[in-house]
Amino acid sequence: MKLRRKVYMVAGYNTISMGTGRSEFHPKKPRPDLEDYIKEAGENVLSEIGGAGNVDECVIANFIASRYNKQANLAAFFPYIDPGLTNKPCVRVEGACATGGLGLATGIKSILAETADVVLVVGVEVQNSVKAVYGADILSAAGWYKERKDGHAHFFPGKFSDRAGVYFKEYGMEKTRQAMARWYYNAIENARLCPTAQEFENSQKNLEELALTEPNPRLFVDHLNVYDCSKVSDGASAIAIVSEEGLKRCGISKKDAMEVVGLGQAEYDLTRAPEVPLRLTTTEVAVKKALDMAGISRDQLATVECHDCFTIAAIMAIEAIGFAKPGEGSEFILAGNTSREGKIPFNTTGGLIGWGHPTGATGVHQAVTIWEQLTGKAGESQVKIPARKPYAMSVNMGGDDKTLVSLVYKKC
């Protein structure tokens, strides 16, 4: 299956990923609200595409503001961004941590359906509005909430700790822990180059040594420490999805755009445990669909944004994409392949661990990061995009490998 119409992304924008680690953040002092992030991200995209009058449709991606912020009906914030968006078709989408990816997929399908030539997509989440114990309960809705009562107090860290335990037993703990620590090191080093990253100001030394801190099951989970986990984040990301007609309407050159050439979506039963805890099998399906639609192999990818909600998830994602065989993802990382100078740079602004994880924004942030890379707008975060490898991929995962969106992009 091929895309039947040219689809592009342009004018990406990220707010700061706010939370612990940023000097601006203080849990007891005023800080931006949900609508502030929506407005900042949306306005900045509109300023690059010629204004609200050029927009046909709008999509807002948000996981669960109805609990974090007691706010629903988020699509109605688009006219708040700009009165010129009043009476435009607007919709809100949700799919746990893959919400942003679903927002992108929704916009892409509007372009393909020819109901729109320009779609504004905004992903947003504000999560530092509640104490951690309540936040853990809210986030558990990304899984099957009926498991919450008998599940781990730290619901999702517990899920991926269980996966890590199985992985350690099958493939060896020492090597895997070293790779998890290296992943953390790379994430922070990349975040230090990106001014909007939550870990931009991280000045810790001996990052790998820190990341090898022994897990404390009494205080947290059995097989992960806090450095293995993405943080709680507030922020928004936005991008415009356009047709060729939309490019002309917005006055944007193709050199400032990237083309979408592959889309893969997959879903797994929320009520069922993973059949193969050692693998991200739903991720495998979505990635294959995206690569098949693009008509390329993974070896043609210049960079990848993967969903590293936990360091063990990054190792398993590398295997799911096919860069390493099952059990060999650790060696792939330890050989330097995923670093900035490596064979295939991953998560060049820090990923979920380094840049941050404002849940509904994450999939959109991945697309913005890749747009910056493929158009040469990444600043200090820029990596080489060889002429023979003009493609990139994002993989956005919701829940414990339940909701997946993978996209393949091409440099214009």
Labelled PLM ranges:
Residues 236-244:
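Conserved beta strand-loop-helix elements of the APE1-like EEP
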Residues 246-250:
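Short helix-loop capping/hinge motifs at secondary-structure junctions, enriched
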Residues 92-97:
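Short beta->alpha junction loops
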Residues 1-90, 112, 124-231, 237-238, ...:
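Conserved "HGTGT" condensation-loop signature of ketosynthase/thiolase-family condensing enzymes
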Residues 100:
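Short conserved active-site loop signatures built around small residues
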